[in-house]
UniProtKB/Swiss-Prot annotation:
Species, as recorded: Mus musculus (Mouse)
GO terms for biological process, alphabetical: L-leucine catabolic process
Encoding gene (name): Mccc1
Highest rank taxon of the organism: Eukaryota
Keywords, comma-separated and alphabetical: Acetylation, ATP-binding, Biotin, Ligase, Mitochondrion, Nucleotide-binding, Transit peptide
GO molecular function: ATP binding; metal ion binding; methylcrotonoyl-CoA carboxylase activity
Transit peptide per record: 1-38
Residues forming coiled coils: none
A Gene Ontology cellular-component term: methylcrotonoyl-CoA carboxylase complex
Protein's name in the database: Methylcrotonoyl-CoA carboxylase subunit alpha, mitochondrial
Residues noted as binding ATP in the record, renumbered to the chain: 159, 201, 207-208, 251, 278, 318
PTMs per UniProt: Acetylated.
Job description of the protein: Biotin-attachment subunit of the 3-methylcrotonyl-CoA carboxylase, an enzyme that catalyzes the conversion of 3-methylcrotonyl-CoA to 3-methylglutaconyl-CoA, a critical step for leucine and isovaleric acid catabolism.
């Protein structure tokens, strides 16, 4: 009996230490209530295979360990040394880095499940989690698929079908075209009838893939083709639907659970309105400003949606909501969501444990009336991306990674450690920072406090952007909607952020003290007592020494006149402002800290020097100050080569629109690159004629590689 096996496993392991990342906000006794219902016959689950990678694989493995269920990981060649491989009881290689040859290879995963004797497969999210064929294949092979039946995945995965089912179930839907005629002309005609702006959406899938907003007929064709390519790449299906685009809506979703006995409940709503590239970046539960009556109606509509397709397991019903709190069905995600931890935090539940128990044949652990809603939770997604460059995803090693401490109201969901690499082949998410407090304002304060403690060096991240976002007055007021980032672009992404002179003094002080440390180390180990490198500080008895230092903020050089004083302090002058500076470096927990006093104001910052850049992290924020490198030592400029275009990141050339000899205008599309599962269009930087195209379709281009070269313009005579 599946449920009995699971309960016995829990009993055997009840004295194990619960991983701190999964400790609940309060010591609720919900686990005792999960055992009130009788068990039902089913297949025994003693071992589960996780058909995924990264943080969600780690998340499932932790709960499996807590329940005494053995875990089996799968990994691609790129993930051989990854965190989820180390955490699992067993791990199996399933192929090369590209997901089509590994994490999307159904037959390989089924074969691993058989050879490892895993009775169940947890698909996580993404990859095969909403693949009807995979769910059906598991059933045929006698393997429990931890998710809904394939019929529910089919009905909810095809958006046109799901809209019809929802309308029949009495769930409000948005006006649109969901027909079988997929010709460009038909879609264009319906877009015109609906009225611009419209949303082009992939019939299958989700996560912002294959989705485009079209504001005029002139741009319809290009956006349609782009959405088709991305949908084909992500879901192997380029069918599209057209919907009326609701300006400044809220994205509100409801967590639901169903079981094999016909029961269904909702675990309240989440607000996921704040997005970039149609992907969520910060989520919260419950949704701000929603009164109990609207909350009940949302939940009941979501349960009707789940029951309409005989839903089993974890699912999310997504709605768009207007300013008057009218809501309309958007789609149903037939899997566990990325943002599920905020629901766990406000309800005191472990949704992965619910998934495993329900898959084993148990009833839903709690009735609707027993599910509590207490406090407020936020989740911030920390990505390897450059917000100042249109959120361009990045890849590379996490040279330095330090995080806030996990406690009963703070969770860090991650699949990487310091020294690991964010791969170009997969989603660039580094971690999810999840916090809980008794009310929204307290939770928001805790989120900002923890973000200040999330320090990353080695690649660009969005941590500073998340700090600006969470500190914006309109966000604090709960006035969120899907256009929040574009509407507040100037506040969230300032074009010129000036570094305070005090921060420049901190960087200069850190470099001087680091120089002294290196000099002392040299003197300690050198055999040449008369080496000039033994005397580099410039300090002499009864003499003040002055030197000029040049640091760089962005593209601007900053000259600091530094005077070494006899008492060990420094006088620094930047422009016409003077500072008295003193301090020291110390080491704590493997990190270097700079303690400084600048004009009598004490500061403490984490100090990291990497690749001619000083990184300072403190509770006031983070800054980067560059150390200029002579031009003859500099690499090729990232602005371009030979007046052409360069690859903004490492990726695959998906489409090439031009050839040598073509004339183009500034803004014309030259190529399409695929990286981090996202499509990026390379535009012409100027008018001109193409001299050379360096890559063909399907080729791999490294970051900063020249893509297209323009002919030299003839000078005016």
């Amino acid at each position: 009996m599946a449920a009995a096996a699971l309960l016995a496993a829990v009993d055997r392991n009840q004295l194990r230490r619960v991983p701190i990342l999964l400790l609940q906000p309060r010591e609720w006794a919900w686990k005792l209530r999960t055992m009130k219902y009788g068990t039902t016959p089913g297949g025994s689950i003693t071992k589960v295979l996780i058909a995924n990678r990264g943080e969600i694989a780690c998340r499932v493995i932790r709960t499996a360990k807590k329940m005494g269920v053995q875990s089996v990981a799968v990994y691609s060649e790129a993930d051989r040394n990854s965190m989820h491989v180390d955490m699992a009881d067993e791990a199996y290689s399933i192929g090369p880095a590209p997901s089509q040859q590994s994490y999307l290879a159904m037959e390989k995963i089924i074969q691993v499940a058989k050879s490892s004797a895993a009775q169940a497969i947890h698909p996580g999210y993404g990859f095969l989690s909403e693949n009807m064929e995979f769910a059906e294949l598991c059933k045929q092979e006698g393997i429990i698929f931890i998710g809904p039946p394939s019929s529910a995945i089919r009905d909810m995965g095809i958006k046109s079908t799901s809209k019809s089912i929802m309308a029949a179930a009495g769930v409000p839907v948005v006006e649109g075209y969901h027909g079988k005629d997929q010709s460009d002309q038909c879609l264009r005609e319906h877009a015109g009838k609906i009225g611009y702006p419209v949303m082009i959406k992939a019939v299958r899938g989700g996560g912002g893939k294959g989705m485009r907003i079209v504001r005029s007929e002139r741009e319809f064709q290009e956006q349609l083709e782009s959405a088709r390519r991305e949908a084909k790449k992500s879901f192997n299906d380029d069918a599209m639907l057209i919907e009326k685009f609701v300006d400044t809506p809220r994205h509100v979703e409801v967590q639901v659970f169903g079981d094999h006995h016909g029961n269904a409940v909702y675990l309240f709503e989440r607000d996921c309105s704040v997005q970039r590239r149609h992907q969520k970046i910060i989520e919260e539960a419950p949704a701000p400003g929603i009164n109990p009556e609207v909350r009940r109606k949302l939940g009941e509509a979501a349960v009707r949606a789940a029951k309409a397709v005989k839903y089993v397991g974890a699912g999310t019903v997504e709605f768009i909501m207007d300013s008057r709190h009218n809501f309309y069905f958007m789609e149903m995600n037939t899997r566990l969501q990325v943002e599920h931890p905020v629901t766990e935090m406000i309800t005191g539940t472990d949704l992965v444990e619910w998934q495993l128990r329900i898959a084993a044949g148990e009833k839903i652990p709690l009735s609707q009336e027993e599910i509590p809603l207490q406090g407020h939770a936020f989740e911030a997604r920390i990505y390897a991306e450059d917000p100042d460059n249109n959120f361009m995803p990045g890849a590379g090693p996490l040279v330095h990674l330090s995080t806030p401490s996990a406690d009963m109201s703070t969770r860090i969901e991650t699949g990487v450690r310091q020294g690991d690499e964010v791969s170009v082949h997969y989603d660039p998410m580094i971690a999810k920072l999840v916090v809980w407090a008794s009310d929204r304002q307290s939770a928001l304060s805790k989120l900002r406090y923890c973000l200040h403690q999330y320090n990353i060096v080695g690649l660009r991240s969005n941590v500073d952007f998340l700090l600006r976002l969470s500190g914006h007055p309109e966000f604090e007021a709960g006035n969120v909607h899907t256009d929040f980032i574009p509407q507040h672009h100037k506040d969230l992404l300032p074009s010129h952020s000036t570094i305070a002179k005090e921060s420049v003094c901190q960087a200069a002080l850190g470099l001087i003290l680091k120089e002294k440390e290196m000099t002392s180390a040299f003197k300690l180990h050198t055999q040449d007592q008369f080496s000039p490198f033994s005397f580099s500080s410039g300090r002499r008895l009864n003499i003040s020494y002055t030197r000029n230092m040049t640091l760089r903020s962005g593209k601007s050089d900053i000259v600091i006149a530094v005077t070494y004083n006899r008492d060990g302090s420094y006088d620094m002058q930047i422009d016409n402002k003077s500072f008295r500076v003193l301090g020291d470096l110390s080491s704590e927990d493997g990190c270097t800290y700079l303690k400084s006093s600048i004009n009598g104001v004490a500061r403490k910052s984490k100090f990291i020097l990497l690749d001619n850049t000083v990184h300072l992290f403190s509770m006031e924020g983070s800054i980067e100050v560059g150390i200029p490198v002579p031009k003859y030592l500099s690499p090729v400029s990232a602005e371009g080569a030979q007046g052409g275009t360069i690859a903004p990141m490492t990726g695959t050339i998906e489409k090439v629109f031009v050839k040598a000899g073509d004339r183009v205008k500034a803004g014309d599309s030259l190529m399409v690159m695929i990286a981090m599962k996202m499509e990026h269009t390379i535009k012409a930087p100027k008018d001109g004629r193409i001299k050379k195209v360096f890559f063909s379709e399907g080729a791999q281009a490294n970051r900063h590689a020249p893509l297209v070269e323009f002919e030299e313009e003839e000078s005016d005579k």
